Amino acid sequence: MTSLPIILASSPLRNLTKPCSTSQIPKPIQNSTKQPPIHLLTKTNLSVTISQLIITSPVLASESFDSISSDPSSGKIDLESILVTIDNFFNKYPFFVAGCTFTYLVVYPAVMFYLRKYKPISAMNAFRKLKNESDSQLLDIRDVKTLALLASPNLKFLGKSSVQVPFSENDEEGFLTKVKGSFSDAENTVVCVLDNFDGNSSKVAELLIKNGFKEAYYIRGGARGKNGWLAIQEELLPPPVHMYTAKNVKSSNNNEASVVGTEN
């Protein structure tokens, strides 16, 4: 039978109670790389998670790409998407687009032309207006040399007279002063403007409206142009309002003199 001291000496409890030397204490394993701070790891993991979520979700991905393409801070415009949108709108509403185009190109100019107070007028309609409207007058804006070769229409037959004021683009104020001096009541006067053709007459008609005249019409073709006063007077206008050239005046005077001589 083994004695008690021998048993205690060989017991593991005795070995545990012995203090360990410092050389026998195991050292912790040290990593060769340093660990980053915990808050950096948190931010990195969060950003990676969000990016993965966007990529895996088709709805969020499309919204993100749309926001990038339409981001005003980038300073870029997606012309292709704009053109596609316009094309889709035209294809979806063709009648609306056609109506807007017709209104802009046809209706609007026609309404503006009708509402404005200076308009073109044919020589025949100008004669009718001078005949039927008491407040209408004829303004001849041709220069002095032209008036010497081709006189203004004689309106004594209508109880009126042609007003002759040569127009000069370099002296519009002086021209307006003379015209207003020739018509006592400009606000109630309708003026038919006659030129050699119809180049300056439209400018004068617009100028008169801007300066207080009731209405102003510029005669199409003027005195010498196509369908002008000279062109229609033989067929459509009565002889008292005809325009005569210097040759016609001389020939008419010679004919009268010859008639008087034969009678004597």
Swiss-Prot record:
Chief location bin: plastid
Transit peptide: first to last position: 1-60
Gene (name only): STR4A
PANTHER family, A to Z: RHODANESE-LIKE DOMAIN-CONTAINING PROTEIN 4, CHLOROPLASTIC, RHODANESE-LIKE DOMAIN-CONTAINING PROTEIN 4A, CHLOROPLASTIC
Lineage, highest ranks first: Eukaryota, Viridiplantae, Streptophyta, Embryophyta, Tracheophyta
Recorded superkingdom: Eukaryota
GO cellular component labels: chloroplast; chloroplast thylakoid membrane
Boundaries of every Rhodanese domain copy: 132-232
Record protein name field: Rhodanese-like domain-containing protein 4A, chloroplastic
Key words of the record: Chloroplast, Membrane, Plastid, Transit peptide, Transmembrane, Transmembrane helix
Transmembrane feature ranges: 95-115
